[in-house]
Each structure stands twice: as C-alpha cells, then as structure tokens.
Regions:
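Hydrophobic alpha-helical segments
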Residues: 1-148
Length: 148
C-alpha cells in the first residue's frame, strides 16, 4: 500500500505512523484489533485489507475456524463477549458511521473501559479509511509466492 502512496511520501509516513500507534498502544488485545480490522476489510470488500489482516490474525494465533466464522460472530462460540461487542460496533459503524445503536453501545460499555472504547472506535475509523483508500487505488493482494 505504501508503495502506491509514494507520490505523496508525507501521507504514507503519517498513515504508517498512525496505524503503528493504533496497533502497538493501548490495552485492547491484538487479536481483537485484528478481528476488527479484518471485519472492516471484509465489509468494504477490500481484498488487499482482508488478505493483510488475515495473515496478521493467523500470526497472532487466530485459527482458520475462527476466521471462517467471522461473518457469524454474533452466534459463533469462537468469539468472546468482548470480541462480539467490538465486532458489532465495527459492523454498525462501517455500515452507518453516524452513531452506534444503543444496544451496541451498551455491549461495548459492558466489556470495555472508556479508553478501550476510544481505541476500538479509532481502529474502526482508521481501517475504514485504509480500506476505502486501498479500493480507490485499486490495490490487490500479492500472490503468496511474491510475499515470501
């Protein structure tokens, strides 16, 4: 992605720094952050984002069974209540970014503190930006052989 942004290096640098900060800081588990990022990519039909975040999730120990039930997170036993709340917020805000439905907001508050909620919302927002930018730039995932 950052190669595609080479015509504007400052944008590439600031975006990379922001994504790194979201990934490396805070108290929301890395697994949850990656599931949220993956869900955003999936909802926005961003092949590039989905591929990248599937690989990261797998590297964090998320198994294929969990990834295959992401679309059914609300009922799948593969996800904790906290993950379900974060994923419900992801779906709600990716589809309708103006406000969280009260039930989704309540689920977030039942599972996360205020700082963690800000973290989750920032991850949702950043990944929506990245997926839309990636789609607009026409980015596609590289074949696995090219990434090795």
């Amino acid at each position: 992605m950052f190669e595609a942004l080479a015509a504007r290096p400052q944008i590439a640098r600031s975006l990379a720094a922001h994504l790194r900060d979201l990934s490396d800081s805070g108290t929301v588990p890395a697994r949850t952050k990656e599931l949220v990022a993956l869900m955003v990519g999936w909802l926005n039909a961003c092949e590039y984002c989905t591929c990248v975040h599937e690989e990261i999730a797998l590297s964090l120990g998320v198994d294929e069974a969990t990834l295959s039930t992401l679309g059914d997170f609300a009922t799948s036993p593969q996800f904790s209540d906290a993950e379900r709340a974060a994923l419900a917020a992801t779906v709600a805000l990716t589809r309708e970014p103006r406000a969280l439905p009260p039930a989704v907001s309540q689920a977030l508050r039942a599972n996360y503190d205020d700082g963690e909620i800000v973290e989750i919302l920032a991850i949702i927002g950043a990944n929506n930006y990245v997926s839309r930018l990636s789609n607009s730039l026409g980015l596609r995932p590289e074949p696995k052989s090219a990434r090795s």
